Every structure is written in structure tokens, then in C-alpha cells.
Amino acid sequence: VVYQIYPRSFADSNHDGIGDLGGVRDRLGHLTWLGVDAIWLSPFYRSPMADFGYDVADYCDVDPLFGALDDIDGLIADAHALGIRLVLDWVPNHTSEQHPWFVELRRGTADPKREWYVWRDPSPSGGPPNNWRAAFAPVPAWTLDPTTSQYYLHCFLPQQPDLD
């Protein structure tokens, strides 16, 4: 049995009104009682929260809303001790516009790592490269970066540039 948990709304261990990793850890006994074999844990990485954590700014850190690295380490250890596996919801499609990679690549077009994201020149009319629309918003899937004068692709929010 796989049980998906969105930490923000699952359980709040520090009484700040926001669910956190400590809250998940506190409820492991209940999940064991339910017969859960694995937890699918929605994003808890450092994020500006434009899309509730799916706009990851740092894949190697825990957002302070949810706790700290020690909290995820403890959750993993306790879950494994109870025979529960964790599946971490990793977002490989895009990052936050505040991710260091994207921030660096907005400075210019000469960096060879620029191909890590999808960049295109404007169309001959000066607009977006094509008429694609973002999935969740009634906006184009392209946003013009004023520094480089190129558009970047975002299939979701403009704050979530797509990785190539």
C-alpha cells in the first residue's frame, strides 16, 4: 500500500499552522496500523512556494516551512525501522526561477550550461517563439527574459522554467 502525503497539510508538529516533516514522523505509527508499505512524499525542498513546493530552488535542502535536513533524515530512519519505504517526489521537469542554475544563466547567453533550460529567440514579430500555452495558467508557455532578450519555456508557471 502506497500512501501519498502532502506534508504541508498532513500534520503540524510545531503548531505553526503548516504541516511539516515532524508531523509526518509523528504519524508513522498510524500509517503502520493502516498497513502502509510506502509513503510517496510530496516536495519538501527549499522553494519560494509559487506552486506549493513544486518550484524547487534547492534540491539539496529542506524548506524551513517543513523542517531541516535532520528532520528528513529522522523520518527516513524511523520509517525504515517500521518497514515503510519513502518515495520522494522529485521534480525533474523544471526548477524555480530562483534556483542558482537559472539565476546564473539569466546573466548572459555565452554559458555552455545555458542548454540546461529551454531558451529561444523571439519570433520574427518579436513575440514568443510559438503559440504554446502553459498547462495551469491561461498564459503563453514562454516568458521573455529582459536581460538576455530570449524567451524561456515554462509548461507550468512562469516561475518554473523548464529544464531541457
What are these regions, as identified by a protein language model?
Residues 1-164:
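Acidic/aromatic-lined carbohydrate-recognition and catalytic surfaces
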